[in-house]
């Protein structure tokens, strides 16, 4: 009897997507034998109602650009095309309907898993997918409250990179080369993303630094 398809689901704001996300998805794909990883940019993040978030189309397009070269990566619009706040339960339910024969593996930050009991329709989550928490080396998950066997942890050194840090660097006029894919550096510059209203200095994008 053949094994069911295994599909990874990586949800996130991706504002912007960076190498930490990509390395984490690639590592989990290899370790768990996933056929593909579907990146799902959040539509309206319910946890970030008081934060300024870039338009969904910009975040979607950056994710498409960043993942285009990996044949095992795909990008889904299920969250950004759904009206209202984005909840993981809705994301997984929609993907379950699209891939009824597959086992879903939801990839997220291990720190987020510590708050999972506060998530919308939490009782459904572990029925819809196995959860994989990606974390920095040495991180200890306080997971006594999580169902046994429902969560796996994977250490990813590149998780030290954060979207918040990338936005702060752009706002301060600092480069984000090598923190995000080259195409994302160019997209941010073209769209003028993450620049504060009082940022008169702009960002010195210039050519990509050489390896010499």
Curated annotation (Swiss-Prot):
Gene that produces this protein: nadD
Source lineage: Bacteria, Bacillati, Actinomycetota, Actinomycetes, Pseudonocardiales
Organism: Saccharopolyspora erythraea (strain ATCC 11635 / DSM 40517 / JCM 4748 / NBRC 13426 / NCIMB 8594 / NRRL 2338)
Reaction equations catalysed: nicotinate beta-D-ribonucleotide + ATP + H(+) = deamido-NAD(+) + diphosphate
The keyword Signal belongs to this UniProt entry's keyword annotation: no
EC class (word): transferase
Pathway: Cofactor biosynthesis; NAD(+) biosynthesis; deamido-NAD(+) from nicotinate D-ribonucleotide: step 1/1
Annotated protein name in UniProt: Probable nicotinate-nucleotide adenylyltransferase
Family: Belongs to the NadD family.
Function: Catalyzes the reversible adenylation of nicotinate mononucleotide (NaMN) to nicotinic acid adenine dinucleotide (NaAD).
A single MF term (Gene Ontology): nicotinate-nucleotide adenylyltransferase activity
NCBIfam families with a match to the protein in the record: cyt_tran_rel, nicotinate (nicotinamide) nucleotide adenylyltransferase, PRK00071.1-3
Keywords noted in UniProt: ATP-binding, NAD, Nucleotide-binding, Nucleotidyltransferase, Pyridine nucleotide biosynthesis, Transferase
Classification via Pfam families: CTP_transf_like (PF01467)
């Amino acid at each position: 009897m053949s094994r069911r398809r295994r599909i990874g689901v990586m949800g996130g704001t991706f504002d912007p997507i960076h190498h930490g996300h990509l390395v984490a998805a690639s590592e989990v794909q290899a370790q768990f034998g996933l056929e593909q990883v579907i990146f799902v940019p959040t539509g309206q993040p319910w946890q970030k109602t008081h934060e300024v978030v870039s338009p969904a189309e910009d975040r979607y397009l950056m994710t498409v650009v960043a993942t285009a070269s990996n044949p095992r990566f795909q990008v889904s619009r299920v969250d950004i095309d759904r009206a209202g706040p984005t909840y993981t339960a809705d994301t997984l339910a929609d993907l379950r309907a699209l891939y009824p024969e597959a086992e879903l593996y939801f990839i997220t930050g291990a720190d987020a898993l510590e708050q999972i009991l506060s998530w919308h329709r939490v009782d459904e989550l572990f029925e819809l997918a196995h959860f994989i928490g990606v974390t920095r080396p040495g991180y200890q998950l306080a997971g006594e409250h999580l169902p046994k066997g429902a969560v796996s942890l994977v250490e990813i050194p590149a998780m030290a990179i954060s979207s918040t840090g990338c936005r702060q660097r752009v706002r301060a006029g600092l480069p984000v080369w090598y923190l995000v894919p080259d195409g994302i550096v160019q997209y941010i510059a073209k769209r003028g993303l993450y620049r504060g209203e009082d940022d008169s200095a702009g960002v010195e994008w210039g050519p990509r630094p050489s390896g010499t």
